[in-house]
Amino acid sequence: MSGELNGNDTSAQAAVSAGSVLEGAAFADEGEQHNESMKTLVLGALGVVYGDIGTSPIYAFREALHAAATNGILARSDILGVVSLIFWALTLVVTVKYVLFVLRADNNGEGGILSLMALVRGALKGRPDLILGVGICGAALFFGDAVITPAISVLSAMEGLEIVAPNLTPFVVPATVVILVTLFSVQKLGTGRVAIVFGPIMALWFVALGASGLWHIFDDPTVMAALNPYYAVRFLTVSPAVAFVTVGAVFLAMTGAEALYADLGHFGRKPIVRAWLWIVFPCLLLNYFGQAAFILSHGEAAALPFFQMIPSFALWPMVLLATAATVIASQAVITGAYSVARQAVQLNILPRLEIQHTSEKLHGQIYIPRVNLLLGLAVVILVLGFEKSSNLAAAYGIAVTGNMLVTTVLLYIVMTRIWNWRVSRALPIILGFLVIDMLFFSANIIKVHEGGWASIGIATVLVLIMWTWVRGTRHLFQKTRKAEVPLDLIVEQMAKRPPTIVPGTAVFLTGDPKSAPTALMHSLKHYKVLHENNVILTVVTASKPWVASADRARVSQYNERFMLVTLTFGYMQQPNIPRALGLCRRLGWKFDIMTTSFFLSRRSLKASVHSGMPLWQDKLFILLARTASDATEYFQIPTGRVVEIGTQVNI
């Protein structure tokens, strides 16, 4: 689309006008921000949000052409049909669905599948388990995507070596593994120092995409006719069977679109949309149309068109730039996996995980060792198992299309329950999105035997883990509650017949403030003493990402010995109990960490035949509970102030 850069033809003016209309529609309710700040955010969005979709041209068009070829032969109509499908898919799915609609469905500024789930659960209280199940499936598919993205991205970039130096072909897989192992190994150091260059590198990458595509559009300018949807429709109808398979490959051009919503909280809607409309979208289109024009004039180039259309003098720089871009894309996905894992822990979908902060200034920069290890192992195994990016392509589409399908379903609930749209207004839009999503999903699901099993397998395992944890914690709560004593009764008894009173404050953590904490009961049973001040502490996770400090703590006094404190954190916030309790000073309780002891109960779980869950699920839940991060570390309580009391529970 040369006109979109030089502005010399009517198609360029139409594109600019369309961009203005779309941007106006997207920002109708937002005020202007400072230009310099906006430029910085747009540049940052290029480095984080668009790495995945920005590296798709390396392999997406190639895979679509391979699928469209009949007996290895491509007709002109096939090439125009494929590039037309890519253009309209990017327009309808990314520009219309995500930019105009999904990005508006923020949960107090945050995006992502779990944020959307939490938003919908708050609005649709009648069927919380159904929405939870949908959210779990979406999160599992996201993690599946997080495994495949680094593998296919870096592998596809390294395959450029086959063009630069064919004798290096045997080293493609080993070099990919070395890069990925290095990438995962340095995660614990944090990305703050290097992330500053992500934006400029990706900006250079998009310029290279656009320039190389624009240059080759002049090989056959008639390729611009593919902007007409006629070519896409004709391709779909002339040979439906071939077209159906090709649609699954065309979807590779959109992998990474979900990142627009997932990273909403990092940059805000306006920078993400501007980066897409004015930089990413035009450059992607120029490259795809350039590849199509190059193949129309060089029919033998369908093997690796992205690299084959690069001049020989620029091949090495392009391979290096592509490698850097795919590493950045992988880093963005890894960071996203940490963020989703933290949300899942806070929403009690996963057991507690050790979370390390890698920046003193930016709380969002975190490192989760267990997620990093498992993700890294899975990525390396995929690379060694599939060996070529074309083999991984089948596995890639299922995870992303499934995630997009879940997003569409939840978006309908947001439209009707939160935006208060009439069904007659929301349903036609959602049905349109569902038709497109189902087309892409069904075209990818048939590739199970070609590699799609990997994506489904990863998602299935994660769904089992998350649902087992949710079900197990509920079952454990119900079982222990039956054996617990009401807190009101204990408080009343202690007032009538108080045991020996010792100085200081005791804080008892509990998930059920109506029942006496197990640690309190065992303390009374074994030590037969009661502290001067006893705090029954409950930590609650809100259905919104952030809770202000002013709303963090609620304090209610039972009597002179007992008080109930509830601390509320957003699902994007890391609980810090001592710091939060310090806020209680303004509520009348002068918290002093040096005179306070924290009593925690550590449960030893044993599987039971009559637990209410299958035995295998009992054992899996027990394993997950044993691997959970220590509560002392997770809640950031000083170890010297903690007393742990062990109990055994049969589940």
From Swiss-Prot:
Cellular component annotations (GO), alphabetically ordered = plasma membrane
The way it spans or sits in the membrane comes to: Multi-pass membrane protein
- Catalyses which reaction(s): K(+)(in) + H(+)(in) = K(+)(out) + H(+)(out)
An annotated Gene Ontology molecular function: potassium ion transmembrane transporter activity
Q: Does the keyword Nucleotide-binding apply?
A: no
Main location (coarse class): membrane
Which subcellular locations apply to this protein? Cell inner membrane
Q: Where are the transmembrane segments?
A: 41-61, 82-102, 130-150, 163-183, 194-214, 235-255, 276-296, 309-329, 366-386, 395-415, 426-446, 450-470
Keyword check for Ion transport, yes or no: yes
Biological role stated in the UniProt entry: Transport of potassium into the cell. Likely operates as a K(+):H(+) symporter.
Family designation: Belongs to the HAK/KUP transporter (TC 2.A.72) family.
Q: What is this protein called?
A: Probable potassium transport system protein Kup
